[in-house]
């Protein structure tokens, strides 16, 4: 009798994700308990300084080599001179700065009238009223000069960002290897704190409008690159084949086939460029950029809420106007005329805009208020608003409520959470983050999460990073508890949903640091005010994506639930919310990204996190430290973005959703 044996070769099967993840969490908990018992080695609690690489010193050495030895500083100074000429020209035209060509300023009424005509061409009377009304408000509220200081940089930075982004996007589309290198760079650029953009701009391009224009341009380039590449990749093969059959050269294919076919995506990129430029040009007030941002900072410093609110409204109106007009440009199809159509018919709106501009320019020479609104003629009600707010804050009931909220959050929630997170050993913290990524997303994400947080630990800024993360998680958790129920209730009725989404748009377009004022006035210089300022900003995407997720639940699913006799709550919990979860997860991810952005601005309240250290770097030339701190924020933000989006994609695939 013979016995047949079968040999198995290969490696042992890998542990299931759940088992491995729970084991990692168990190990992290055990290490934390050992630390509390005083039995954990000190080097496992915090990495010894001896093994912390001097990243900042290395970066400073590279920076000094590039700046001095390679002559980059001399080159950027030449570029600065050229950029100053352009900025001086726009400043002269828009608000009368005494520079070439010495023909400004253009009357505010001429700009308002011309913009109204452009608005009518793009979107009819409503758009015309919005566009013209925005500039009328800006002039009559007494903010024309500071608004035009901001716009004089915006009209230079936005075209620069568009041109550079378009060229790089086309290059990435043509070269997959270049695209593969560019993608991670763009991911980092989109998550870097805005302070990290400001210091290099100051060092290479001087303090003021030139540095502001450069920082604004660089900040706005990434979405233009991404949308250009996406649009060109989506051009249908049939369109390409038709161009080749027509005998087009490479340049003709790009100019007359690819770019027109990718028009929608490219114009969406233009919209994003304009909005990011407006957001950043306000924030460049921190490096001496005059305009709305600088005035808002000055008003905030003296707690003039009324004037701050009026400036915030102006920024919101400008943002909404530019957003709506650029979006209308995206959807508006090019007009085609028969051969021989007269010029004045083909370009009637252009002629109307020129006519309105010239007409009001001439009228303004006779009617002074149409050229410049004096202080006595201004509609500003800033002082009256300040009086109302002070009266509101003096009400006993308001003080009792805010004091109670501050006490409960500070004593029972925020301080214990901060102390607990700081008490966790570094290695245990990294293990826990990696385990969470493994359970939620997968092995690849777990490895990257461990690498990212491990690198944060190696920078030597671990405690500051943990405090930053604690502020983000605390604010987003409260935002989740408030934002999701608001979104669920609002999604029930179309009118309510539209009203709430309008409120979200308005809240998102307000300058981010304006939220610091009510937080400080209500809750003082405390951790509560930091969290509250982040909370308002980060709650917007949670509300928005909850509404969108519930709106996009397939009708057949809700109809099936109705036919099965489900109650409203059963339908919500068992059908609508599960199907909306992938979309809601995107909102949660956006909330965390917004929170990481806002927590840096909240450093002005007096935090002890990375934002405070980043703010200090602006006072000197410590570029290495600036980059290291910015990378710490980026690595933490990228970890959450990677894990949440992977979970959302997997959930969509399991549910069969596009």
UniProtKB/Swiss-Prot annotation:
Gene Ontology molecular function: amine transmembrane transporter activity; carnitine transmembrane transporter activity
Positions of the ABC transmembrane type-1 domain: 147-326, 465-644
Subcellular location: Cell inner membrane
Pfam families per the UniProt record, alphabetical: BPD_transp_1 (PF00528)
Primary site of residence: membrane
Superkingdom: Bacteria
Keyword tags: Cell inner membrane, Cell membrane, Membrane, Repeat, Transmembrane, Transmembrane helix, Transport
Biological process according to GO: choline transport; glycine betaine transport
UniProt induction comment: Expression is induced by TMAO.
Membrane-topology annotation of the record: Multi-pass membrane protein
Transmembrane feature ranges: 20-40, 103-123, 127-147, 153-173, 185-205, 212-232, 273-293, 300-320, 349-369, 420-440, 447-467, 469-489, 517-537, 585-605, 627-647
One GO cellular component term: ATP-binding cassette (ABC) transporter complex
Keyword Manganese annotated: no
Assigned protein family: Belongs to the binding-protein-dependent transport system permease family.
Matches recorded under PANTHER family: GLYCINE BETAINE/PROLINE BETAINE TRANSPORT SYSTEM PERMEASE PROTEIN PROW, GLYCINE BETAINE_PROLINE BETAINE TRANSPORT SYSTEM PERMEASE PROTEIN PROW
Subunit structure: The complex is probably composed of two ATP-binding proteins (TmoW), two transmembrane proteins (TmoV) and a solute-binding protein (TmoX).
Physiological role: Part of the ABC transporter complex TmoXWV involved in trimethylamine N-oxide (TMAO) import. Responsible for the translocation of the substrate across the membrane. Is specific for TMAO and essential for TMAO metabolism.
Protein name per the record: Trimethylamine N-oxide transport system permease protein TmoV
Native species: Ruegeria pomeroyi (strain ATCC 700808 / DSM 15171 / DSS-3) (Silicibacter pomeroyi)
């Amino acid at each position: 009798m013979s016995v047949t044996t079968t040999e198995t070769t290969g490696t042992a099967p890998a542990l299931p994700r759940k088992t491995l993840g729970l084991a990692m969490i168990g190990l992290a908990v055990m290490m934390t308990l050992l630390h509390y018992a005083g039995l954990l080695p000190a080097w496992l609690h915090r990495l010894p300084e001896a093994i912390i690489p001097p990243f900042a010193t290395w970066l400073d050495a590279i920076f000094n080599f590039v700046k001095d030895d390679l002559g980059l500083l001399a080159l950027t100074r030449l570029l600065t001179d050229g950029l100053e000429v352009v900025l001086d020209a726009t400043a002269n035209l828009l608000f009368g700065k005494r520079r070439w060509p010495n023909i400004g300023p253009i009357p505010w009424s001429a700009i308002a009238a011309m913009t109204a005509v452009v608005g009518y061409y793009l979107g009819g009377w409503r758009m015309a009223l919005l566009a013209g009304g925005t500039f009328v408000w800006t002039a009559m509220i007494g903010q024309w000069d500071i608004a035009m200081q901001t716009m004089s940089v915006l009209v230079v930075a936005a075209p620069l960002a568009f041109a550079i982004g378009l060229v790089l996007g086309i290059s990435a589309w043509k070269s997959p290897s270049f695209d593969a290198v560019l993608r991670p760079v763009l991911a980092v650029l989109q998550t870097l704190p805005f302070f990290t953009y400001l210091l290099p701009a100051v060092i290479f391009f001087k303090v003021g409008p030139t540095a502001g224009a450069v920082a604004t341009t660089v900040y706005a380039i990434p979405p233009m690159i991404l949308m250009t590449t996406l649009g060109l990749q989506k051009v249908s093969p049939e369109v390409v084949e038709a161009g080749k059959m027509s005998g087009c050269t490479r340049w003709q294919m790009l100019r007359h086939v690819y770019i027109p076919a990718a028009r929608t995506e490219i114009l969406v990129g233009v919209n994003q460029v304009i909005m990011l430029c407006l957001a950043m040009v306000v924030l460049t007030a921190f490096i001496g950029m005059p305009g709305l941002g600088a005035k808002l900072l000055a008003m905030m410093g003296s707690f003039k809420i009324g004037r701050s609110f009026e400036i915030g409204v102006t920024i919101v109106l400008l943002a909404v106007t530019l957003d709506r007009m650029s979006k209308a440009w995206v959807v508006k199809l090019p007009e085609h005329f028969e051969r021989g159509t007269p010029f004045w018919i083909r370009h009637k709106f252009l002629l109307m805009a020129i006519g309105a501009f010239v007409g009001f320019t001439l009228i303004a020479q006779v009617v002074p208020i149409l050229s410049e609104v004096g202080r006595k003629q201004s509609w500003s009600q800033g002082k009256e608003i300040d009086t109302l707010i002070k009266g509101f804050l003096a009400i006993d009931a308001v003080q009792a409520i805010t004091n109670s909220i501050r006490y409960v959050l500070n004593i029972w929630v925020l301080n214990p959470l901060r102390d607990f997170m700081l008490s966790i050993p570094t290695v245990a913290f990294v293990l826990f983050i990696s385990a969470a990524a493994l359970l939620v997303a997968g092995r690849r994400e777990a490895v990257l999460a461990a690498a990212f947080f491990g690198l944060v630990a190696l920078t030597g800024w671990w405690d500051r990073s943990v405090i930053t993360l604690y502020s983000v998680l605390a604010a987003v958790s409260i935002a989740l508890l408030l934002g999701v129920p608001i979104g669920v209730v609002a999604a029930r009725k179309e009118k309510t949903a539209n009203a709430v989404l309008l409120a979200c748009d308005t809240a998102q377009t307000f300058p981010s640091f304006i939220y610091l004022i009510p937080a400080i006035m209500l809750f003082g210089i405390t951790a509560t005010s930091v969290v509250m300022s982040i909370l308002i900003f980060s709650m917007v995407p949670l509300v928005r994506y909850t509404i969108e997720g519930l709106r996009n639940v397939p009708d057949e699913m809700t109809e099936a639930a109705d036919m099965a006799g489900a109650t409203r709550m059963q339908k919500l919990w068992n059908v609508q919310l599960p199907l909306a979860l992938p979309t809601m997860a995107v909102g949660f991810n956006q909330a965390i990204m917004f929170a990481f952005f806002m927590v840096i601005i909240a450093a002005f309240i007096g935090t002890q996190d990375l934002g405070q250290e980043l703010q200090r770097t602006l006072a000197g030339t410590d570029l290495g430290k600036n980059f290291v701190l910015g990378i710490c924020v980026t690595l933490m933000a990228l970890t959450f973005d990677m894990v949440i989006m992977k979970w959302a994609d997997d959930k969509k695939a399991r549910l069969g959703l596009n």
